[in-house]
Amino acid sequence: SNILIISGHPDLTTSNANKAILDAVRARFGDNVKIRELDKLRVNGKFDVPAEQKALVEADVIVLQFPVMWYSISSLLKQWIDDVFEYGFAYGENGTALQGKKLLISATAGAIEDVYRTMLPRDVSATLTEFENTAAFTGMPLEEPLYSYGTTGDPDNPAVARAIGEDHGK
């Protein structure tokens, strides 16, 4: 399978867990995975839409990897979806380019899982249900999502967040 990971972290240089996930995936899958780091691909506020669409067409599996930010996806990933999933490409008349490609959501949450279970009315999976509609609308089977919690970690000990990310990436 050709795996495409769309990294929606707004600044990977500040992330321990998300960077570790990408490193672990690269180590495991080698040349079978392509990673698009959106924080490096947006130039002057815009994406190269034809290049992004080409990467999607070449993939069998599309992984959206991102940190949960205020119980949603990053604005960077949202812009990418808005720009790239165009009418006639992802949906609508002749919009069949994504049909049959597997979609996997891979998200990290800074808070520990207990916070979502005891202090908030919904857990992370409930806040990301928009992907069920996106997958259905574009004809992509939605795979079981992967979530990692507690990825903010201890600022004095970034190894904890990296370890969580490495485990998530396996």
What are the residue ranges of the model-derived segments?
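Short histidine/acidic/glycine/proline-rich micro-motifs that form metal-
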Residues: 10-13, 40-43, 121, 151-153
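Glycine-rich phosphate/pyrophosphate-binding loop and the adjoining helix
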Residues: 22-26, 130-170
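Generic recognition of short, well-ordered alpha-helical segments
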Residues: 16-20, 47, 75-79
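Short beta-strand elements in bilobed, periplasmic/extracellular small-molecule ligand-binding domains
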Residues: 31-39, 141-147
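Helix-loop-strand module that forms the ligand-binding subsite of alpha/beta enzymes
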Residues: 51-132
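N-terminal beta1-alpha1 ligand-phosphate binding loop
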Residues: 1-31, 36
